Amino acid sequence: MRASGIILHITSLPSPHGVGTLGREAREFADFLRRAGQKYWQILPLGPTGYGDSPYQTDSAFAGNPYLIDLEQLITDGLLTREEVDAVSFGSDPAQTDYGALYAGRFDLLRRACERGWDKERENVDAFYRENESWLRSYALYTAAKRHFGMRPWIEWEDEDLRLRRSEEVLRRYEELLAEDIRFCIFTQYLFFRQWHAL
């Protein structure tokens, strides 16, 4: 049986927040494809990107890209305010993505959402963590450690015990030291997958 579809990364959808997200625009596009008789939407990888922001150069095969979290939904959920979101510049040219502005603005807003939502969503976040602990524990520690070591590649991190040996004692020490950033990573993954599954 023959079928047709389209290839379009979610970031290519229109958005006032720098890149397309898992929000209303994605739902409307999926509805449009259905009405147009299309059976497939190839979305390309959705993992968190690093330097260069290519969806094919990701830090994890399992994690979702925080850029794709819909800020409008976070306003609806009471985790952000309209004023906070509107105060952030995601770049001056709507035809091009300014990844520097996107990174700075988006992560500041997501940190605010985490501060407000961690206790409110704690039971759901804990359940999400338990279901995904096989990859999420390591990924959250990695992202927090990368930030701790100035966003340098892991092979340049000063602590050889963390880079090479990764004993449970060393991991626990860093989990305690970097608890706030680890919590932020876990919360953003929770938000991403909640929105992804809703789509």
Place the predicted regions along the sequence by residue.
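Acidic/aromatic-lined carbohydrate-recognition and catalytic surfaces
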Residues: 1-199
